[in-house]
Amino acid sequence: MFVSYKWLQEYVDLTGITAKQLADRITKAGIEVESVEVRNKGVQGVVIGHVLEREQHPNADKLSKCLVDIGEGEPVQIICGAPNVAKGQKVAVAKVGAVLPGNFKIKRAKLRGEESNGMICSLQELGVESKLVPKEYADGIFVFPSDAPVGADALELLYLDDEVLELSLTPNRADCLSMIGVAYEVAAILGRSVKLPTIELHENNENVHDYISVRVDAQEDNPLYAGRIVKNVKIGPSPLWMQARLMAAGIRPHNNVVDITNYILLEYGQPLHAFDYDRLGSNEIVVRRAKKGETIVTLDDVERTLTEEHLVITNGKEPVALAGVMGGANSEVCDETVNVFIEAAYFNGATIRQAVKDHGLRSESSTRFEKGIDPARTKEALDRAAALMAEYAGGEVVGGVVEANTLQLKDVVVTITLDRINRVLGTTITKEEVAGILTNLQFTFTEDNGTFTITVPSRRRDIAIEEDIIEEVARLYGYDHLPATLPIGEANPGKLTPYQAKRRKVRRYLEDAGLFQAITYSLTNEAKATMFALETAEPIRLALPMSEERSVLRQSLVPHLLEAASYNRARQVENVALYEIGSVYLANGENELPNEKERLAGVLTGVWHAHLWQGEKKAVDFYVVKGILDGLFALLGLENRVEYKQAKREHLHPGRTAEILLDHKTIGFVGQLHPNVQKQFDLKETYVFELDLEALLNVEVDDIRYTAIPRFPSITRDIALVVDEHVVAGELQKAIIEAGGELLKDVSIFDVYKGDRLPEGKKSIAFSLRYYDPERTLTDEEVTNVHEQVIKAVEQQFGATLRG
Amino acid sequence: MKERLQQLQQEALEKIEQANDLKALNDVRVAYLGKKGPITEVLRGMGALSPEERPIMGALVNDVREAIQQALEAKQATLEQAEVEKKLAAEAIDVTLPGRPIRRGNHHPLTRVIEEIEDLFIGMGYTIAEGPEVEQDYYNFEALNLPKGHPARDMQDSFYITEEILLRTHTSPVQARTMEKHQGRGPVKIICPGKVYRRDNDDATHSHQFTQIEGLVVDENIRMSDLKGTLREFARKMFGEDRDIRFRPSFFPFTEPSVEVDVSCFNCGGHGCNVCKGTGWIEILGAGMVHPNVLEMAGFDSKKYTGFAFGMGPERIAMLKYGIDDIRHFYQNDLRFLQQFNRV
């Protein structure tokens, strides 16, 4: 809402307060003033001139030579390029020495040999935005009314000496979508009174019912419809002050009738519509829901197809307006209009919102209906419009109002105690202070022993309950006066849940292990949604996606991590190690919330470790990633409960992929990207993993129990076992541990060999076994006994032989 | 004999002096103190001396041996030291060459901000509540005093999946769910961090996915002044001890009264700069007293219980704190961006 500071003074005395100060006060009290626009863009020395003579410039077709009276001394000669300049006009003249926007100084000049002592200005040249200039003056100079006083300051007449406050209104303050509403707010803030416009309505002795009747068939959509007839209007420009105020408020002037409806819309917040009575096509107005497929051509010359969800104003047969949004072209007021039917109605916001949405058509009117107008002022606004049309369009107001009124206006009464106000706010405001604030708001109230009974005026539709009153008191009392305290009451210790605490440790571990935390989007496309997923479900699609790329909820974190790796690689960041913790979404069926499961995933590619001058360089490989995961499982106390199983999974290298099992249940995978997928994402050799984080973090783990530090020496024996090449180390190791019994404490692999020195199809794996008894020193013999059992076991189970 | 001994001592000391390495020194030792050395020989000749002379001469021999021995030891220590120094000199390295790098990743900047905020509120007795990102319309809107048909819940602004299910547009549904779980009994003291979604085109200042942190306290006798005190405490811990806050009246459907909360500019201290656009204040939070409808819908008696709620955007805080100019950075995962947050 744009509020002209000059115009606002019609309703509230602003003596002693500048526009800037006013803006600060309004902002502090709750409505943000986004900007204060100074309308004068540096213009000086522009006055009203009277064009006494105009003739063709002798040397230029497109120039006129004018003799202009500017109210000082002899009339001056001015050369003017505007096509519409004519003898007898009152125009804006920038005198010699004047300044126009952009610090453009007007000097005495010779144009094609003719002297020019100033410049006749268009509105644009004075700094008015083109979209606000009346259409008839769009390409020429602005012509003032004939009574404009010669020599007067043109800026003042055009309100270009004004300042405009732009209010950013929250949806609850629709009351301030009108000058009167703003005046009430300002009056409350400043503690001053409001002057409402006086309406001098002179009706003739005809009866409006002889001209028109009104019927509303959709009363819920339209509880109040009122109208008046103004006869014998003469379409022409509206008074200059009205045009100037409309332009200040950001509305382009058209003609007197249309300008008056717009002026009332701004003044009262009540949208009006003026129909050409003679073009209505009947003597009745019927308000109803549109029929499916019915059409209307609106004022913007667009044909719109309607549905039963839209409300229309009809002449009993066909629509003449899309209610509350825009009038129809068929009944539009035009230059030939003589008799006007003015509509003032109260439409349901939701109904109007539907039409706005369906037709992508938002207007000053629809905005106000959507947010809610004050129905108690509807008829007053209608009267004021009729009175102005009589005054400024030479019309004659037909006696009476036609209306269909099922509106039930009930006073909103709120009762609240002083104690409650202070208890909620934590303040010690006095009874007198509350009374003062309510008085300034011009709320009617009674007070009895600290209990206030308040009747809320109909313009403040946002106030209905105690808390609303508390807010009014708080904002006008001033939040700066609110003390700062801390809650009193039982203090609970704050802490993370075990899951949250472990999740933080997982993050920190992975970061200390060299991975960076990524956060990627949850929405993806259909193809990527299920790629790599540990569990898959029906894809969950948005009803109205903004793009195909962000239309489905992900079931794995890996695809977007691959995109991130690819994004980096495309920017010459080749070495990437990222992890993400985030949700995947598994459908549970229509209208059920999906299962949201937290996953941990990672992507690693490029060089893992490089210390080049010492000759160290290591690319990421399967075992780098596995090592990181092993560390993670150890961190969580799960190292002995996790297994890796060779696996084949879609999109992964068939020979370099493992499924990860926790307590024999699959909880994730790690593997190298399949070359085809690698290519698809434009990556080099890349490894990925994804784990069910909830399974990892929710599993019960024993608390740490101290075990005695070894007091006796341990004995280490190494063996190299030759086995068939398909035998996997993990199985071999498991067998060794089993056979080694209690005395075998550690088994580690220190060599793997495959090659010329072994028969075809064989490999050798070397293990180091450490034996230890916490109670005593082991003898060589005892160890040998166990060790031989171990060797026997692997011989029997795997056909392993000792490598010579 | 005496002269002979003095001469031997003289000779030996000179040779010790001349010895350049441990081997040469050892040769001197063997030559003079060895069993076949000249001093032993002198000792053997002592039999020819008179009993009076013998102890005198014996003492003299010992003195000479002692002197040579001492000289040998001293020289040995010097030579050994020299040897060590030589070895160390040969072992010198260029300490300016780079060390073996330790690979280290780090938190995403949003996590950094979120964890810092979480910890501040945990310190004030809050717990962290989490909830689903795919939500029922009821918890996302209705339970928060946004009934059906309310303009703020337009299909155009939210990602709906069905008419009743959508991607949550704020973390407030977690508040509604948590209150419901409390079955009308306070106190409730939570903060809710999480991802939220809005139907916005991604650009420098908008992202269809972003994060929020909201806080909620419900108990008997919670006052708006408690909200102010709590947020002032938060602002000071988060942005510096000399920060102040101010409330500006505002509107949210789920709180009444509602306020926007500004923190005095941590860049200029409130004098006005480009971070605070010359105002000295930076808008950080939205807050207010929980609307009685919200309390009642969650099963709390709004006559007995009051509460406050607040919400903020980690993206905005991170952007202000670190001077980040484009919200898309948070979701591109460019390592050149992420790596900048790798220190205290």
Swiss-Prot record, chain B:
Main EC class the enzyme belongs to: ligase
Subcellular location per the Swiss-Prot or TrEMBL entry: Cytoplasm
CDD domains tied to this protein: PheRS_alpha_core (cd00496)
GO cellular component assignments: cytoplasm
Cofactor: Mg(2+)
PANTHER family the UniProt entry points to: PHENYLALANINE--TRNA LIGASE, MITOCHONDRIAL (PTHR11538:SF41), PHENYLALANYL-TRNA SYNTHETASE (PTHR11538)
Quaternary structure annotation from Swiss-Prot or TrEMBL: Tetramer of two alpha and two beta subunits.
Aminoacyl-tRNA synthetase recorded as keyword: yes
Gene3D superfamilies: Bira Bifunctional Protein, Domain 2
NCBIfam families linked to this entry: pheS
GO molecular function: ATP binding; catalytic activity, acting on a protein; magnesium ion binding; phenylalanine-tRNA ligase activity; transferase activity; tRNA binding
One GO term (biological process): phenylalanyl-tRNA aminoacylation
Cofactor comment: Binds 2 magnesium ions per tetramer.
HAMAP family assigned: Phe_tRNA_synth_alpha1
Residues that bind Mg(2+): 256
Catalytic activity from the UniProt record: tRNA(Phe) + L-phenylalanine + ATP = L-phenylalanyl-tRNA(Phe) + AMP + diphosphate + H(+)
Listed name of the protein: Phenylalanine--tRNA ligase alpha subunit
Keyword Transmembrane appears in the UniProt entry: no
The enzyme's E.C. designation: 6.1.1.20
